[in-house]
């Protein structure tokens, strides 16, 4: 066992004295030691139940003959961090989580790990760590929140943000906003739509790193406690069989996850996280891989914010495996990929079926023949940009309009709420990329303000920042190269005409090459927005959005 390095032989007698201090028995020191990475805290609604999930995992590990040992991982609530300086500290935690988990796992020589994440950066950070460490590893998330109910309709956090925009437009009263505030988030769990957290938990299941139901069983269901116990048992089975994370996280399983992403209509943030996970196994994942996958993958689900259904509905309809069964039946998945259950994807989904074609549409009745995401390129985004095509209204799939240019999120919000943005405009928010932000803030407040003010079907937003999974509309993010490194988005001037062609996968600035070259010759880098602390270090190491905003391993890279 790996843990023998820390516990066996006369040389490790001092370490054993410390295990004795922890209360380990002599019998426990002979059993596999399983690290349980707990993301529990009291500031993230999606993590406030994780202590209960962790306790269930511990029971499962012990039942199967292992010794469970809990250690922590940090987690940020993107909703609470939204709209202020705190959002600069969200994406950056992904790599902190991966790095700190690596340190804990290797320092203490665990034989296996159970990751218990739930929210946005916590899930991909731990997936990166799992791929890097290559230990027997199982994921079990905290689970999604139930939808709220306002005036007889299901609602979620995205409708809360849009309510603020409606209030600014004068179409909603303060009392109406208060009712949303009190009712849209009724339980613990990751916010109830197909936002980033739930997207990544579903893709964890598609990758094979979580058991059936990992992405969809609601946080408050007792079924999730059972799932956690089974996760503890499953990691012991992996230890006994010698199955490790890289047996499961492979190029093929990542492409499976990308295919499921397209069918589910996941958050655009998956186009940051899948490349980062792939990087950990040495797979150079180009975000432009998304387009050929999207071209042949039907979009089967329109969960909030794209439609009126929620994670609890997807769970009742058969969950991720039911979606995967639809895709496998038309040959779009590699069903030979291994899962943490010890079975292949094909074996796992063999008994899955679609219980509600209104929630999971059949291939014959798909929302569209193409997938939920698209990568657009052109002279405004030579290295690509990402849009959630499934959340764009038909009239905005092709659009041309004048640029309204802002060098920060705050300036853009002030203009939108001040009535300075009109139908046809293309809002450009730049210097918000991984390096320029720094931290690549989510532009949920601007997109929600646009939607709430009734401009969602006539105004587009383009940024080198990113979007919450709760954003909808013609919201094009991850524009690469970013403004801070002199990308073309830095050269856009007020009134320039921008052409968006989502079906054609094009994002163009209607300015001549000669004019762009002249502007580039005059361009000067901005002074860093942050000159101290972790963000300074992050800005010096982070790569572009099209590379997953991974960190360089050296200054020369």
From Swiss-Prot:
A Pfam family this chain is assigned to: ILVD_EDD_N
Residues where N6-carboxylysine is found: 121
Cofactors (names): [2Fe-2S] cluster; Mg(2+)
Active site (catalytic residues): 468 (proton acceptor)
GO CC aspect terms: cytosol
Keywords: 2Fe-2S, Amino-acid biosynthesis, Branched-chain amino acid biosynthesis, Iron, Iron-sulfur, Lyase, Magnesium, Metal-binding
Annotated binding of Mg(2+), by residue: 78, 120-121, 442
Protein name per its UniProtKB record: Dihydroxy-acid dehydratase
Top-level taxon in the UniProt lineage: Bacteria
């Amino acid at each position: 066992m790996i843990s023998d390095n820390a516990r066996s032989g006369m040389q490790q007698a001092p370490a054993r004295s410390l295990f004795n201090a922890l209360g380990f028995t002599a019998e426990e020191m002979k059993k596999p030691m399983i690290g349980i990475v707990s993301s529990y805290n009291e500031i993230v609604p999606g993590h406030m139940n994780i202590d209960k999930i962790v306790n269930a995992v511990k029971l499962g590990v012990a039942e199967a003959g292992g010794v469970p040992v809990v250690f922590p991982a940090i987690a940020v609530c993107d909703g609470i961090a939204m709209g202020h300086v705190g959002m600069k500290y969200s994406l950056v935690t992904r790599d902190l989580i991966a790095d700190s988990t690596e340190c804990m796992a290797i320092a203490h020589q665990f034989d296996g790990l159970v990751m218990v994440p739930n929210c946005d950066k916590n899930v991909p950070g731990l997936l990166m760590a799992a791929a890097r460490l290559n230990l027997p590893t199982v994921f079990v998330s905290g689970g999604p929140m139930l939808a709220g109910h306002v005036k007889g309709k299901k609602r979620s956090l995205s409708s809360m943000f849009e309510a603020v925009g409606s209030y600014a437009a004068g179409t909603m009263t303060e009392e109406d906003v208060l009712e949303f505030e009190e009712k849209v988030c009724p339980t613990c769990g990751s916010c109830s739509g197909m936002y980033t957290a739930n997207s990544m938990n579903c893709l964890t299941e598609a990758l094979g790193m979580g058991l059936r139901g990992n992405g969809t069983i609601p946080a408050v269901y007792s079924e999730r406690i059972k799932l956690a116990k089974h996760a503890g048992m499953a990691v012991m089975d992996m230890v006994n069989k010698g199955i490790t994370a890289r047996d499961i996280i492979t190029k093929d399983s990542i492409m499976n996850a990308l295919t499921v992403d397209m069918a589910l209509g996941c958050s655009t943030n998956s186009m940051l996280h899948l490349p980062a996970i792939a990087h950990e196994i040495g797979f150079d994942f180009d975000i432009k891989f998304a387009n050929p996958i999207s071209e042949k993958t039907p979009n089967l689900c329109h969960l909030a914010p794209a439609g009126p259904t929620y994670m609890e509905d997807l769970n009742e309809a058969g969950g991720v495996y039911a979606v995967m069964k639809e895709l496998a039946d038309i040959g779009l998945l590699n069903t030979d990929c291994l899962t943490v259950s010890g079975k292949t994807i094909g074996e796992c989904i063999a008994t899955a079926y679609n219980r509600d074609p209104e929630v999971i549409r059949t291939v014959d009745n798909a929302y569209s023949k193409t997938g939920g995401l698209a990568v657009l390129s052109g002279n405004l985004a030579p290295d690509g940009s990402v849009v959630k095509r499934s959340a764009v209204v038909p009239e905005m799939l092709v659009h041309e309009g004048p640029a309204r240019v802002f060098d920060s999120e705050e300036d853009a919000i002030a203009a939108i709420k001040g009535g300075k943005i009109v139908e046809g405009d293309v809002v450009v928010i730049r210097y918000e990329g991984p390096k320029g932000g720094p931290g690549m803030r989510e532009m949920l407040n601007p997109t929600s303000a646009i939607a709430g003010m009734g401009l969602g079907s006539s105004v587009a937003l383009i940024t080198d920042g990113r979007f919450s999974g709760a954003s909808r509309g013609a919201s094009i993010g991850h524009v690469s190269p970013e403004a801070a490194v002199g990308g073309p988005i830095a050269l856009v001037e007020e009134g320039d005409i921008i052409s968006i062609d989502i079906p054609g996968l094009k994002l163009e600035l209607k300015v001549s090459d000669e004019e762009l070259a002249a502007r580039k010759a005059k361009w000067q880098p901005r002074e860093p927005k942050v000159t101290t602390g972790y963000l300074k270090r992050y800005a010096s190491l982070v790569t572009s959005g099209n590379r997953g905003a991974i960190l360089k391993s050296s200054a020369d890279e």
